[in-house]
């Protein structure tokens, strides 16, 4: 039921259609790039042996459902990069005309390496060519495994899939090399709403939209929230509200979402550096900090940031008040069903605290205890 474990096989012919509509198709003109105010790049890389390819296709169908309901994309465009296998990927433009969506396959890639800064930058350059716009945003649909490095020698976490992982530092560098800072980056993946990720991406985007914990296989309810994401001024509060409402009524009612204003990550880093000088975390109190990975990692790697600050500050009420006020600016919008789930742990967990971001500073997990010290966040705060 999670973004980690789905195996559904769909024919790639779906990419050339509009979700199974058998009505006669009117002759169409070749796609010609036209500049708009906004463009959203949907990046769906190969997800490996535990493929969620079928789920990603359903996500695209849900996006089209939202577009049809709103009778178009407004001042926005959508361009999709989706990998059907380890070797084959497609660049697809989603358009709207006469009450229907249309998918134009603009390019097919064979063995394209999108895991390097150069590969990412080159792909984003193609995005600019095919969808010229004043503002760009990204939606990323794949697996996410927290900030844990794809190799123990790497300093940051990865996303994508086990076969072709993408390191967040390479992703960040690729965006910067392309010269197209995103309005928002939405990770439709597990474990991506962490302070380590947010700090790494502070120059790549204005906002981070992600989940602190595991994401159900259904993913983001795009048929509900896409209209807010395509708006000239995205309604982040509505995104969180409709996400929470959807999952509260879903068959697997587990979910978290948060919007992080990356402009405040530097201020939070400076605050944490100061507090780490004057305060020491008592490991005997680690069980008092809210766990957000529910035994996916044992011992826990992902703790709630607000909960950690409460325990770290202890009886220092003024410092804790300052911390919570800053956290409210850093995470202006968030939502949760009140319960999270772990495929590995095979059980739900009630949330007693939820700030919208995780932190791994107190983790004693053998895989994290040294690698966390190599992240840009740790170096900025210790």
Give the predicted meaning of each segment:
Residues 53-81:
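Hydrophobic alpha-helical membrane-insertion signals
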Residues 78-136, 140-142, 155-162:
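Substrate-binding cleft of extracellular glycoside hydrolase catalytic domains
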Residues 26, 125, 129, 144-146, ...:
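Terminal, contiguous helix-loop blocks that mediate binding/assembly
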Residues 1-16:
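Sec-dependent bacterial lipoprotein signal peptides
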Residues 51-56, 112-120, 162-171:
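Phosphate/oxyanion-binding active-site loops and adjacent basic polyanion-contact surfaces
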Residues 36-39, 72-78, 131-137, 179-184, ...:
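Loop/turn elements at helix/coil->beta-strand transitions in domains of secreted/extracellular proteins
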Residues 12-37, 361:
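Bacterial Sec-dependent N-terminal signal peptides
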Residues 23-24, 33-57, 61, 83-87, ...:
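Cell-envelope and extracellular/periplasmic
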